[in-house]
Amino acid sequence: MKASMYLALAGLVLLFVVGYASESEEKEFPRELLSKIFAVDDFKGKERGCKGFGDSCTPGKNECCPNYACSSKHKWCKVYLGK
């Protein structure tokens, strides 16, 4: 019983700390997280010759950036997992 009380208290403290940390973070956190996950800088706004994740493309034209492939079903660039 005593251990479960300490565990519940620790959980509440952890929830408070995570909530406070997320409030204090900059608003750019979701964009930074996505750019790190997909290893591209889609949100920087700079011009490039290839299309990034989620951009529309034409299958077979090789318009997508490296590590991406044009989906023939959806017609947008997606992560290429290889075969």
Curated annotation (Swiss-Prot):
Write out the entry's keywords from A to Z.
Answer: Amidation, Disulfide bond, Ion channel impairing toxin, Knottin, Neurotoxin, Presynaptic neurotoxin, Secreted, Signal, Toxin, Voltage-gated sodium channel impairing toxin
**Propiece residue ranges:** 22-48
MF GO annotations? ion channel inhibitor activity; sodium channel regulator activity; toxin activity
Query: According to the lineage, what is the superkingdom?
Result: Eukaryota
**InterPro entries, A to Z:** Huwentoxin-1, Huwentoxin_CS1
Q: Where is this chain's protein located in or outside the cell?
A: Secreted
Q: Which residues carry this modification: Leucine amide?
A: L81
Q: Name one GO cellular component term.
A: host cell presynaptic membrane
> Keyword Signal: yes or no?
yes
Q: In which tissues is it expressed?
A: Expressed by the venom gland.
Q: Which residues form the signal peptide?
A: 1-21
Q: What protein family is recorded?
A: Belongs to the neurotoxin 10 (Hwtx-1) family. 15 (Hntx-3) subfamily.
Miscellaneous comment text of the record: Negative results: has no activity on Nav1.4, Nav1.5, Nav1.8 and Nav1.9 sodium and calcium currents.
Q: What is this protein called?
A: Hainantoxin-III 4
- This protein's species is Cyriopagopus hainanus
